[in-house]
């Protein structure tokens, strides 16, 4: 409906084909301040209206767009013509991939049926790092959050530990909810991370360095959940860190790979199940990378 309403944005009403919602170069541009002249030149464009319409599906089925929307939203009250074009590109991606949503499966997930697990990752940036956490079950995401931390991190380790702490809160809430409906989690919920120092801090009481004292409360809270066997941090390589799609703008190949790991399509594709999948879903030959 958003595309139909704004068909005047494209020549002959034809929407360009987009494979990613946000390119690395566009992401870098959105970090720059908007000048008064640029805003005055673009203030009549319907930036907030279109942004709001795109945000709705990202809450439910287009979770892979969360990082793009998070970054674009920083210019909600002050935008330029260039940032409006970037917003339109995100809309084009959403329209191009409108047939790709979320696909849950039964018996295909290596973690087991109805077993909760999660991914937590963060970049390291000033003034605040961008973190992403994804909780999954039956091969597909059930929640995805991509947003800046509320505090300034002093190292990559601290940024990763902060995101782990935030992820433990999501996991604990979901474990309680699942317990109420009879889906008790008998084992600790795995939280995948790609930073070994952060994992060591969370699993070893003697490994908290002096420069990390400022995050004592978060570390202790996360560590308590590990000791209570509610969560278990597990290392995974950066290439397979699904939450990476919520921390930075990625190239086409890596974005599609992580997107389809998160939305469950890659798992179904790899299983060889006789299921008709959209053409833009990752090819079976690329899953084994």
Annotate each language-model stretch with its function.
Residues 1-289:
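Long, low-complexity, charge-biased intrinsically disordered regions
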């Amino acid at each position: 409906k958003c595309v139909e309403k704004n068909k005047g944005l494209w020549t002959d009403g034809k929407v360009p084909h987009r494979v990613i919602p946000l390119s690395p170069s566009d992401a870098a541009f959105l970090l720059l301040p908007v000048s008064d002249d640029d805003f005055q030149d673009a203030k009549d464009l319907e930036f907030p209206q279109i942004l709001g319409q795109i945000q709705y599906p990202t809450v439910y089925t287009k979770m892979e767009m969360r990082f793009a929307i998070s970054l674009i939203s920083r210019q909600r009250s002050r935008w330029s013509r260039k940032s409006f074009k970037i917003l339109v590109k995100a809309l084009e991606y959403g329209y191009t991939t409108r047939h790709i949503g979320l696909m849950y499966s039964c018996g295909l997930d290596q973690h087991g049926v109805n077993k909760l697990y999660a991914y937590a990752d963060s970049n390291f940036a000033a003034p605040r790092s961008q973190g992403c956490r994804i909780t999954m079950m039956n091969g597909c995401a059930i929640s995805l959050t991509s947003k800046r931390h509320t505090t300034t991190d002093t190292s990559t380790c601290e940024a990763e530990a902060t995101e782990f702490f935030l992820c433990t809160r999501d996991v604990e809430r979901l474990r309680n909810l699942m317990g109420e409906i009879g889906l008790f989690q008998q084992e600790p919920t795995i939280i995948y991370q790609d930073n070994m120092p952060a994992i060591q801090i969370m699993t070893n009481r003697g490994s908290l360095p002096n420069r990390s004292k400022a995050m004592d409360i978060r570390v202790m809270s996360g560590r308590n959940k590990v000791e209570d066997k509610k969560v278990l941090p597990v290392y995974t390589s950066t290439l397979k860190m699904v939450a990476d799609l919520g921390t930075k703008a990625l190239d086409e190949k890596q974005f599609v790979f992580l997107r389809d790991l998160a939305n469950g399509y890659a798992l179904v594709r790899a299983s060889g199940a006789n299921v008709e999948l959209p053409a833009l879903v990752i090819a079976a030959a690329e899953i084994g990378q």
